[in-house]
């Protein structure tokens, strides 16, 4: 992960936002203080019907058969149509070359250059090796879970069946996962 030292240059894969921004319309004047102070993690929703895929002129953004929305960074021309189309703000533009600011280059993951859009890809290079995405592994509070919601034996499915959950902006028809 590049350390630019200037927040405006950062490339975001995951970040936090106030609850009211993440789930507009779900909080109200009588929401408890805990809910109002909550800052849920935000990242690509890997939508069932991703608008970013439809608008990409080079097909650099695509949806895999397993539902993960991916990017071919070598095909990206940096037009930012995908950024404009994403209703979740889940994409970042590399305005600077990230390589000089990256302490350790991951040989399993290509480095991108200035002028390319990035997003969360669920650490597909880790998934290919059978390991969890880095954010899930690093979260000390165990607030993040990864898995196949269609698999009735998966942790994510169990959580969806036993805990309250919200889909971000479900009314848009993108089918956020």
What residue spans do the PLM features occupy?
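Non-ligating segments of multi-cofactor redox enzymes
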Residues: 1-177
């Amino acid at each position: 992960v590049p350390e630019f030292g200037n927040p405006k240059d950062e490339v975001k894969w995951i970040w936090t936002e106030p609850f009211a921004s993440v789930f507009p319309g779900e909080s109200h004047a009588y929401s408890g203080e805990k809910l109002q102070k909550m800052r849920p993690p935000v990242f690509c929703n890997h939508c069932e019907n991703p608008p970013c895929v439809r608008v990409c002129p080079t097909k650099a953004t695509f949806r895999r058969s397993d539902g993960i929305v991916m990017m071919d960074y070598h095909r990206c021309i940096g037009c930012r149509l995908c950024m404009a189309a994403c209703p979740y703000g889940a994409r970042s533009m590399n305005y600077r070359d990230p390589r000089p600011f990256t302490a350790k280059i991951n040989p399993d993951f290509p480095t991108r250059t200035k002028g390319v859009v990035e997003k969360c890809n669920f650490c597909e290079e880790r998934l290919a090796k059978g390991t969890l995405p880095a954010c899930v592994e690093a979260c000390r509070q165990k607030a993040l879970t990864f898995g196949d919601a269609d698999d009735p034996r998966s942790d994510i499915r169990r959580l969806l069946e036993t805990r309250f959950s919200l889909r971000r902006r479900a009314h848009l028809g993108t089918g956020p996962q």
